[in-house]
């Protein structure tokens, strides 16, 4: 019995040794493969492949190979920023995005990366600054204007939020979320007429797309606004501030 156990233990150790050797060869193969590639864009693709499998450290090593040859290759810095952000290493991600923008001030993807990081840290003014920079070259991008409007809303600059939501629906009249948000913006501005107009648009678009949630929100907003329209400032204050009637 002891002899059988010793034999089994020997084979187990042998299998573990062979597995370790196999893994080591794989790692060496990966390193040699990246060292044989000279095209920086191909190396970045290889790094992205590593990133998708969660091998962040290997991906960063590959990108560092690119930067050893050309430290001013902005796409490599940008990709490092993406990897570090996904890895939840914000400090390193911030440094990488900033480096990409420093090298190429019109690198919009890197600026959007910075804005994403600032949003996660609730640094809305800094995020807004990056979105506005991107908007200089992407004037007709509804997605960018939507993000700008959101930042202004968070900063409680309501007129500016309205301005950019309006720009969104000018570019894309069927942008349902922008119309929904405009209801809240006009409600905040006590511009009941405009709010009612947006409710009509939202109900039309939501019926067209069978979006029951948007329809429900619009109907609830309609009830709320109708209840507020004919109230005096004194009435509104009495109903919205304690002690409540």
Q: What name fits each language-model region?
A:
Residues 52-62, 86-99, 120-133, 155-167, ...:
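Structural signature of tandem alpha-helical TPR/SEL1-like repeats
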